[in-house]
Amino acid sequence: MSQEEIKDLTLLGNQKTNYNFDYDLNILEAFDNRHQDNDYFIKFNCPEFTSLCPITGQPDFATIYLSYIPDKKCVESKSLKLYLFSYRNHGDFHENCINTIGKDLVDLLQPRYLEVWGKFTPRGGISIDPYYNYGRPNTKYEEMAAYRLMNHDLYPETIDNR
């Protein structure tokens, strides 16, 4: 990559990283996708996601799976890590966390397709696994999003692996 392509990336390689413990959308950064002529998935797995229950203040733990088909922009991975870390002291329901993450990334990237799946560890004997997806309107990706939403969990895993 040229210096011009990475001039707006402020976090990658920064030795004085500031870890924000409160939700902060402005942490996210993107760079140009040099393969816009290809449809391809980029997938991130975050096995150490934490947030707080908005009622009890107790920590919630999850693995977050994020997959997307980029268009013009790709998310910079260190900024994504710090953005997800910023949920550490953020009090919100699991469903809201996953939907907010998805919408923030759609706003930043304008991807062709994006999905976020949160697999939260059980609390009180029940686990919650919210799923968000987006397909660009009036394209095949909108149809893909509808199909994947309807079929995303046909064969649910057992939860004894968490």
Swiss-Prot record:
Subcellular location: Cytoplasm
Molecular functions (GO terms): preQ1 synthase activity
E.C. designation(s): 1.7.1.13
Main location: cytoplasm
Any GO BP: tRNA modification
Gene Ontology cellular component list: cytoplasm
Protein's pathway: tRNA modification; tRNA-queuosine biosynthesis
A matching Pfam family: QueF
Positions bound to substrate: V75, E76, S77, H94, E95
Keywords tagged on the record: Cytoplasm, NADP, Oxidoreductase, Queuosine biosynthesis
InterPro entries: GTP-CH-I_C/QueF, NADPH_dep_7-cyano-7-deazaG_red, QueF, QueF_type1
Top-level enzyme category: oxidoreductase
Active site: C53 (thioimide intermediate), D60 (proton donor)
Catalytic reactions on record: 7-aminomethyl-7-carbaguanine + 2 NADP(+) = 7-cyano-7-deazaguanine + 2 NADPH + 3 H(+)
NCBIfam families associated with the record: QueF-II
Function: Catalyzes the NADPH-dependent reduction of 7-cyano-7-deazaguanine (preQ0) to 7-aminomethyl-7-deazaguanine (preQ1).
Family that this chain belongs to: Belongs to the GTP cyclohydrolase I family. QueF type 1 subfamily.
Name listed for the protein in its UniProt record: NADPH-dependent 7-cyano-7-deazaguanine reductase
Organism: Streptococcus mutans serotype c (strain ATCC 700610 / UA159)
Organism classification: Bacteria, Bacillati, Bacillota, Bacilli, Lactobacillales
Record gene name: queF
